[in-house]
């Protein structure tokens, strides 16, 4: 993703290893503009339709993976370009967008369109759209971890005990 959407993908991915005991790198979040864009906007990085595939190949994306593009508007060139390349290379794709019939949905095997309506502050997607995307990401990773056997009943069975509160 780019901007808020990319940051949310990174947050969700970073929570999987300590919560479910999966290896770092099993769930990866990428943001247009690279890691420096996590804390400070890298202007125009989202406009490059070729960079996402370059970023994905650095992580050895293959037909064994699923790549989920996150774009509130559903029009971000970085995300759409990455999903197109994934499909051309046999990688299963999904997307999370907040606009119906968005261009990103056309390049996704499994599109998720969450219609939240206009933001209170026009042009900002970190409010309703961002909240809806975060909830959806949590549902996806939780369901995957349940299917992978990382949850029994309602308990995380491979959680990494990393502080006194958890021990």
Q: Which residues make up each language-model segment?
A:
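Proteins with a high burden of low-complexity, intrinsically disordered sequence enriched in S/T/G/P/A and R
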Residues: 1-2, 162
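Glycine-rich phosphate-binding loops that contact phosphosugars or nucleotide phosphates
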Residues: 2-135, 144-148
């Amino acid at each position: 993703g780019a901007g808020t959407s990319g940051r949310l993908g990174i947050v969700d991915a970073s929570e999987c290893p300590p919560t479910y005991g999966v290896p770092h790198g099993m769930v990866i979040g990428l943001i247009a503009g690279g890691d420096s864009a996590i804390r400070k906007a890298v202007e125009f990085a989202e406009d490059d339709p070729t960079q996402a595939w370059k970023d994905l190949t650095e992580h050895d994306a293959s037909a064994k993976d699923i790549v989920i593009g996150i774009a509130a508007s559903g029009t971000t060139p970085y995300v759409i370009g990455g999903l197109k390349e994934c499909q051309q290379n046999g990688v299963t794709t999904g997307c999370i967008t907040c606009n119906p019939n968005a261009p990103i949905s056309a390049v996704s095997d499994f599109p998720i369109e969450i219609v939240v309506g206009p933001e209170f502050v026009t042009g900002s997607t970190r409010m309703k759209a961002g909240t809806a995307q975060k909830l959806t990401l949590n549902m996806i990773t939780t369901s995957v971890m349940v299917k992978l056997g990382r949850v029994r009943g309602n308990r995380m069975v491979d959680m990494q005990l990393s502080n006194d509160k958890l021990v």
